[in-house]
Structure formats: structure tokens, C-alpha cells
């Protein structure tokens, strides 16, 4: 059973509907005692990094997640949820993140090295480039996934499982131990996204 964390800033409907289509058991909760019954957690996220961290702190979700990760239980962050897994962000103001993964979150510059402007936010379909085999990506086909974001993670390459290109290399899937992140929206990413969610569900069940 997967617990989807409801902290007021996640696209709960689309994530839950994707799990339903895959016949993956799930529940949605903001309560730590309930979430503790899950085998794995999904941290979705839409909005601003400082607002999300403020809510996670005020609602005591952060200390709950700290214990969850310390116990090496699976946690998947999606979009903003992935960014929150890192050490810090400069969105609006310098803000500390959950710190489960090394790195920081910065805004796309909007300008190439040659001085050409490009559109921010990054919105649309981009091809995934897999860098190394992992259980999460086993059997997942090559293809495109759907991004909507203005901020991008700067991190160590050894935790980057897959990336995409948007005027720079964009970490798209990251993993360290049982902490996973997807910058794109797998629940909106057709075949590839659904295959990744299915694999996450299989890993949770030990398959």
C-alpha cells in the first residue's frame, strides 16, 4: 500500500488516478499515524518551494519524513516534491529543503551561454536519457515525459538516473538508497510515466 502525502500542495487527483489505473493500492492522508502504515510514500508537489517547506514544517510532516527516510523506507518525490528532497532552493528566497539528497534548486537562467533567450517555465515533452540501469527503470521503454517547472536541480551526477535536455542537462530521475525523485509528472507522461509508476509499485511489493 502506497501513501500519498496530502499537505495542501500536491496534485493528488492525477497521481491517485494513475495508481488506480495501474491497480496499485494507495491511500491519501495528512496524518502521520495513518501514513506510517504505508509500505512507501509519494510526496507530490505543485507550487513554490518556500511555501511547501513551511507547511511541511508546521504540520510536523517533516519530522515524520525524517524518521521514514532514516528507517530506509521508500519515498518518491514528484515535481516540486522531488525538489523538496534536496538541501536548498533559491526560489523567492534562500530556503532549506528536506536534505535527503545532495544538491540545490535554482531557477532556469532563461539565457543560453551564447546570450539567446529561452522560455521559462520549461513546459512540454522531453526525451529521457537513462544513464545507468536501476531496478526502478528496469523494463521501462525509451520515450518522452511531461515537464512543467521553472527551477532545476544542481546535484552530483552519481544520483542522477536519467536526465533530459532543456538548454542544459536537467536531472529527471534521481535516486539515493530508497529516496527517489522525478522532476517530470509521471502520472501525465503516458507510456513511460506509467511504466515508472508501475515499477515503483512493484518494488514496494518486493517484485
Swiss-Prot record:
Its EC number is 4.3.2.10, 3.5.1.2. Pathway: Amino-acid biosynthesis; L-histidine biosynthesis; L-histidine from 5-phospho-alpha-D-ribose 1-diphosphate: step 5/9. The active site is at 79 (nucleophile), 185, 187. Heterodimer of HisH and HisF. Its main location: cytoplasm. It is found in: Cytoplasm. Coiled coil: none annotated. Signal peptide: none annotated. GO terms for cellular component: cytoplasm. IGPS catalyzes the conversion of PRFAR and glutamine to IGP, AICAR and glutamate. The HisH subunit catalyzes the hydrolysis of glutamine to glutamate and ammonia as part of the synthesis of IGP and AICAR. The resulting ammonia molecule is channeled to the active site of HisF. Keywords: Amino-acid biosynthesis, Cytoplasm, Glutamine amidotransferase, Histidine biosynthesis, Hydrolase, Lyase. Residues 1-207 form the Glutamine amidotransferase type-1 domain. The keyword Membrane does not apply. It comes from the Bacteria. It catalyses: 5-[(5-phospho-1-deoxy-D-ribulos-1-ylimino)methylamino]-1-(5-phospho-beta-D-ribosyl)imidazole-4-carboxamide + L-glutamine = D-erythro-1-(imidazol-4-yl)glycerol 3-phosphate + 5-amino-1-(5-phospho-beta-D-ribosyl)imidazole-4-carboxamide + L-glutamate + H(+); L-glutamine + H2O = L-glutamate + NH4(+). This is Imidazole glycerol phosphate synthase subunit HisH. GO terms for biological process: L-histidine biosynthetic process. SUPFAM superfamilies: Class I glutamine amidotransferase-like. NCBIfam families: IMP_synth_hisH. The gene is hisH. GO terms for molecular function: glutaminase activity; imidazoleglycerol-phosphate synthase activity; lyase activity.
Amino acid at each position: 500500500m502506497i501513501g500519498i502525502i496530502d499537505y495542501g500542495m500536491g496534485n493528488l487527483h492525477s497521481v491517485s488516478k494513475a495508481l488506480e489505473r495501474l491497480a496499485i493500492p494507495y491511500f491519501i492522508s495528512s496524518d502521520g499515524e495513518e501514513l506510517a502504515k504505508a509500505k512507501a510514500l509519494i510526496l507530490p508537489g505543485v507550487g513554490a518551494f518556500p511555501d511547501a517547506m513551511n507547511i511541511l514544517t508546521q504540520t510536523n510532516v517533516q519530522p515524520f519524513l525524517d524518521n521514514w527516510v532514516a528507517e530506509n523506507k521508500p519515498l518518491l518525490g514528484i515535481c516540486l516534491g522531488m525538489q523538496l528532497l534536496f538541501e536548498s532552493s533559491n526560489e523567492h528566497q534562500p530556503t532549506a529543503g528536506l536534505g535527503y539528497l545532495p544538491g540545490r534548486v535554482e531557477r532556469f537562467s532563461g539565457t543560453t551561454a551564447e546570450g539567446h533567450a529561452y522560455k521559462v517555465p520549461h513546459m512540454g515533452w522531453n526525451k529521457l536519457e537513462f544513464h545507468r540501469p536501476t531496478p526502478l527503470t528496469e523494463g521501462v521503454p525509451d520515450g518522452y515525459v511531461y515537464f512543467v517547472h521553472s527551477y532545476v536541480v544542481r546535484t552530483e551526477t552519481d544520483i542522477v538516473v536519467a536526465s533530459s535536455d532543456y538548454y542544459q542537462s536537467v536531472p529527471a530521475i534521481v535516486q539515493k538508497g530508497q529516496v527517489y525523485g522525478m522532476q517530470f509528472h509521471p502520472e501525465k507522461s503516458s507510456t513511460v510515466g506509467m511504466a515508472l509508476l508501475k515499477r515503483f509499485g512493484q518494488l514496494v511489493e518486493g517484485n
